Amino acid sequence: MRPLVVTEFTTLDGVVQAPGGPDEDTTGGFAHGGWLVPFFEDTLGAQMDAWFAGVEDFLLGRGTYEIFAAAWPQAPTEDDPVAEALNTRTKHVASRTLTSLDWSGARLVEGDVVEAVQALRDRDGGELQVHGSPGLVQTLLRADLVDELRLVVAPVVLGEGERLFGEGVIPRS
């Protein structure tokens, strides 16, 4: 069985919405997009490169897929482990609304997402990585399918926005 590993950028108060840019996700009138950018340093970049180098396949929610698919297919892959991984590995996309995917290597998850992800985990191989995709991650956590949770915490408090661990989260350790 291969491990399912989640990587989330989060604030001190648990916000995971739109870390990369002001227009990344304005759902609910969120106006703080790009909050991670001032804190992204070479050390974090090197860590992200190392994590992406260990991926065999990706598992993405619809929103994260759409954000990634708008940016990464055009990115040069030479000397960029993140772009290389995103553009050459399979991307399994969990969505109830998408019917087709344009990004090379992207595949829709069919049927029940928990059963489909369990089947993906049951395969031999390297890491199945989830990046962002907070709604999907919440589903995976409830189903006890996450083997490792990597939280990259930025020293900022936003007070609003989508949180990975909101009201009604099942207590666990």
Residue ranges with predicted function:
Residues M1-S173:
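Enzymes that bind and transform nitrogen-containing heteroaromatic metabolites
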